[in-house]
From Swiss-Prot:
Organism of provenance: Ligilactobacillus salivarius (strain UCC118) (Lactobacillus salivarius)
Domain of life: Bacteria
Name this polypeptide is given: Energy-coupling factor transporter ATP-binding protein EcfA2
Enzyme class: translocase
Lineage: Bacteria, Bacillati, Bacillota, Bacilli, Lactobacillales
Cited NCBIfam families: ECF_ATPase_2, PRK13634.1
Amino acid sequence: MSIQAKKLNYTYQIGTPLEHIALKDVSINIKDGSYTAIVGHTGSGKSTLLQHLNGLLKPTSGEISINGYTIDNTTKNKELGKLRKEVGFVFQFPEAQLFEETVLKDIAFAPKNFGKSEDEAEKIAREKAKLVALPEEVLEKSPFELSGGQMRRVAIAGILAMEPKVLVLDEPTAGLDPEGRHQMMEMFNRLHKDENLTIILVTHQMNDVAEYADHVIVLESGKVIADSTPKELFSDPEWLKNHHLNLPQTTDFAYKLFDKLALSKHSLPLKSEELTDEILKILGGNLNE
């Protein structure tokens, strides 16, 4: 399921004193099966762009196409039902959307709503609960008896129960402690690989961009100012500094180390294991001298 935006523009509250242009000529291409990170400061247009991905917002001008579904300013809401089944959204604090008596019923709600029988919906719910590592014994409990991390997994399982092809993550680890954040990001990465889900992640965490994404889009004042791989983006620290973006911790450490040792020909590490390999190469070279 590829996603293409062509000269996408969006303006809030047109014709009022509060009129605000949120997106300006945005053209992007997100490939099927990719893990795309969208980064930028507050007010850059990230959330506005996300809301175009399943028709929560429709362009003021331009268009966005998702697996053959094209949305423009003439698209009727009744035409968006199938698309919304294929694009699952995980907003910040998705556990706020829980409402059913039991975990199982909450996860099964979406497939039942899309026409599955009760037995079919329950089967899907149990499968998705396993995918997000929810133990069997919690399925008959109230979701409100669970820990915050488990409640979030219930909400995500409910989104997966729609069987989307694209999973859109808007700061999905907000409010979690470091261990919970790591577990959640590893879970999304596993879903990306094992379920062949296209992932679109909005984040301020450059470490997550480096660790998980294969494609990164940078927005600033409603415009796309970079569209590249993480390695390309993080290879220009001066550009990042000028746009008030940080390096991942591993890459930042590598730059400082290479500067200290007056080295410039080593490949850029994004992940901790890549940094370890580079350090071993350096040590090996020094030992051979």
